[in-house]
Amino acid sequence: MVKDMETIVSLAKHRGFVFPGSDIYGGLSNTWDYGPLGVELKNNVKKAWWQKFITQSPFNVGIDAAILMNPKTWEASGHLGNFNDPMIDNKDSKIRYRADKLIEDYMQKEKGDENFIADGLSFDEMKRIIDDEGIVCPVSGTANWTDIRQFNLMFKTFQGVTEDSTNEIFLRPETAQGIFVNYKNVQRSMRKKLPFGIGQIGKSFRNEITPGNFIFRTREFEQMELEFFCKPGEEIEWQNYWKTFASQWLKDLNINEENMRLRDHDEEELSHYSNATTDIEYRFPFGWGELWGIASRTDFDLKKHSEHSGEDFKYHDPETNEKYVPYCIEPSLGADRVTLAFLCDAYEEEGVEGSKDARTVMHFHPALAPYKAAVLPLSKKLSEEAIKIFEQLSSKFAIDFDESQSIGKRYRRQDEIGTPYCITFDFDSLEDNQVTVRDRDSMEQVRMPISELETFLAEKVAF
């Protein structure tokens, strides 16, 4: 089926996944609040990432670094001088655009070139394309453009009681630097030998020129990043390892392979610190978008921090007796973007035999579903006994309890929020201590002893 963002955004708001930020005051451009179901979904995504990339990995450990860091961190990393996007304004609409994305949107939508990438083009090359193609502002319909110029993405604030340059600090634009500055702390305290990785989940902030597409590109966002350190010369082998590992993680959580692709950056597109980068992209309703960047950052970051701090980041290899600065592979995933991908991929409208109405169902992997099951008493007269099942199961799983409306409408509501199993407590349950368990995807129903529910759910929602 063809999916569109408007339908998915509407469902997200209607069912409590995502709300517009500051809604009662007219909102704030491109800010979003995760509702009761959205926070459960996103937390489950983060839990699944941490489980596979940290807890179950023989290589990796986790940290939680501060959002506010010494400004020298950003001087060393190059963010203060180089963390820029190409900005262009339309003189008639007064709207500001990111020039490379303006070109990419035009080429993909108007020319049908889904693989066109403007990242890596010079300002002159981008302006030439805009002029030659006659690209116009979507709002004003005119091609009355300013010149392209750099726009720094760092959010600046002040620490302390006086707002002057000596107290100037920045909201971090990525979580990676918190890992690099803690490299030696972690390596020594955990007695780690190469190869090993350090991962974290946390908020980052970028003053994006043209955020948009719901929670895909926002100014406040959450990252799930791993910095994996290895011996120089082994980085491409490890990059390939993490490409495969990350792709499999997505597939295991029910992302359709047809909606995924791996795209290698060409030489012009590579960041200044990288000798190889691959993006895992997802086909959203609005087009292909990056989910996961898997970059070989070489020894750039550790060397830069060594130069600026005076700290020695050389690793003494106990096997070869060599000393060298480790290379780093960075699989960087946006928690909000991948949550949106799971929302889009799970959404389906399907016909129901014997009914003229389609049912909307979210086919989440059970490990990601906000609720693992819903307990539904067939009648409110049965609620007192049915709530005991809720109390029993909710100590181990996220469980919904719903006693209002007909059982059919309750099934549809649970389908629409992605609950894998509905547990119906009926009048026979009072006598035989069994319940009817309905499967979300197949809609098949089986009778099951109440005593077996916990084991059943544990097996079904495992990841």
UniProtKB/Swiss-Prot annotation:
User: Record-annotated residues binding ATP?
Assistant: 206-208, 216-221, 290-291, 334-337
Give the protein name, as stated in the record: Glycine--tRNA ligase
Q: List the SUPFAM superfamilies hit by this protein, alphabetically.
A: Class II aaRS ABD-related, Class II aaRS and biotin synthetases
Q: Give a short account of what the protein does.
A: Catalyzes the attachment of glycine to tRNA(Gly).
Where is it localised? Cytoplasm
Keywords per UniProt: Aminoacyl-tRNA synthetase, ATP-binding, Cytoplasm, Ligase, Nucleotide-binding, Protein biosynthesis
Name the chemical reaction catalysed here.
tRNA(Gly) + glycine + ATP = glycyl-tRNA(Gly) + AMP + diphosphate
Protein family (similarity comment): Belongs to the class-II aminoacyl-tRNA synthetase family.
Its main localization is: cytoplasm
Q: What class of enzyme is it?
A: ligase
Q: Which GO biological process categories is it annotated with?
A: glycyl-tRNA aminoacylation
Listed EC numbers: 6.1.1.14
Q: How does it assemble?
A: Homodimer.
Q: Which residues bind substrate?
A: R98, E174, F221, E222, Q223, M224, E225, E330, P331, S332, L333, G334
Any keyword Acyltransferase? no
Q: Which PANTHER family match?
A: DNA POLYMERASE SUBUNIT GAMMA-2, MITOCHONDRIAL, GLYCYL-TRNA SYNTHETASE/DNA POLYMERASE SUBUNIT GAMMA-2
- Any idea which GO molecular function terms this record carries? ATP binding; catalytic activity, acting on a protein; glycine-tRNA ligase activity; protein dimerization activity; transferase activity
Which domain of life does this protein belong to?
Bacteria
Enumerate the PROSITE patterns for this protein: AA_TRNA_LIGASE_II
Keyword Ligase listed: yes
TM helices/strands, residue ranges: none
